[in-house]
Amino acid sequence: MNNKPKVCIVGNMITLPYSPDHSGIIQGLQILKDKEKISDYFIADISQHQTYGERAIIETIVNGKPDLVIHGMTDSLSQEWPRFVKERLPNVIQVMSMWDYRPDYMNYDGFWSKWIESGRYLDLITLSNKNQLKWWAKDFGAKTMYWPHGCVVKSIEYDSQYEFDTVFVGSRNESTPYNERVKLIDAIDRLTPVKWVNEGGGDSNSARIGIWKDLGKIYGSAKTTLDISHFWDADGYASGRYFYTSGLGGCAIAKRFPGCEELFPEGTKIYFDTPEEAMDKIKYYLNHNDEREKIKIKGKEWANKYHSYEVRFLELFNWFNL
């Protein structure tokens, strides 16, 4: 490999470009290309597999001749793409990046026994939580690294139609165990009103795409933003929302989880444990405009400095001494 690797990302960055994670990933790679940290990058979009057949995405990866493949979706494990790639490109470095999280007892929705078959073809697995690093390493027989979500870097936007007192953007999933978040938000809403956007959820429907396009305006314009992941039990784990609520200029009222202040210290976000505490903090910042703006600015500055995808990719490259 030369000193400037060529990188392939496997994921929906073409199909769903407006996701803050996806736009942040492309932004980070383009910055690194401009700075000559990488020679080039390309995307193997999941739609190629869905549209053109089982092996189409493999051909895209192989024909691109990357030095490093980052599998960003679990389809790679379910479809055994790491094996097919390794057969054709024996010297390529392959990374499986798991930005999602499920508690151990869920066995990753029953896919675990299939996924671990790809372990022998992976050089590294990155996880967005610290609790499961040893478990994944043992069952996959691969090295693991903590590597959470990041955020896209862009200016704070404003649109008066989104100037809600308190907003939450995310799905309303009533199934167990995801309904714990629903219960928490409903409890807060009974104490102080919460505007819930995208209750129906989904990634590819037109309504969701419209929300993604306007997400910067939503977080930048709302006075306060509820920042709650589906799970808050794992050390270091938060969904992508945790990084781009602040990265897009929101005054984030965040559910506390283990390790949260290592990622965003108090003062860049406002943390709570109970619905009553969330209510108190929401009402305080609704009534203190200057303090609210300070949180927005500090949170964004912190996100841009420590949690951009340029930073994330440099962390990964450093792990491999690239």
What do these predicted ranges mean?
Residues T268-P275, Y284-N289:
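Conserved acidic donor-binding segment of nucleotide-sugar-dependent glycosyltransferases
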Residues K281:
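Short amphipathic alpha-helices within nucleic acid-binding modules
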